[in-house]
């Protein structure tokens, strides 16, 4: 048996090896139990856990990391289902083909499916989960049409991470606040489809030829751009009144920093931005950015980086790393 405490969670591994007496002795203080599931769990031990360790305000996180997560059947967790608020499924060795049965977790708030999973995995049951706010389909295939149909019905979503998103295929998601896109295909409708978006992160997306769609995001507070190496230009962002943070990383063709609004608080530019020189930052000054609290500039050259950072010395926090 393996039990530990991490970030205010009680973490339980190898539950199948626990005796009833050991489970009865568990002292859960943080009201969060994180179950690490690497094999089909023993139903009796789950019942014991419910009997001895689960309180009225206990929340359960399930972390599925078996060699083949397809062998883990959700119905075995039925006795704990109402307490499960978070499910993370990491598929490092075998492709996950199904999440059938996941709708028993009526209080599920967060679902992450990572690494190897069937590109066409059926998500239909998620529509029944009215409290689902966070969905991540991470690092595998692009969305298919049936998956779009499901996502378009997840009106409670606040955070979404996906690959291959095409905004033309989305319906309005009025509650979405945080979007992470890998290989974004089309972003032209994001401002309209996600009117309350506050944070957007865009990773390597070779089909994106410009970022003008950012200008339609009137509620946006944070913009992070990573690996958009085919873009030489970011539009001026000074008319985004709520923008407070921007990060730019690994944009090897970017030639000029965009104009930023005076309310900006955090600026981060680093890693493989060879076309950016000191002159590219001519408007990055304390006068133009009077509310800046933190700035990182790493142009791969200490002298050039420091020439920009020194403008903010003793004004805000500065770093190259």
Each language-model region and where it sits:
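N-terminal amphipathic/basic-hydrophobic helices that include classical n-h-c signal peptides
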Residues: 1-7
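Concave beta-strand-loop units of leucine-rich repeat
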Residues: 11-19, 31-48, 56-76, 83-101, ...
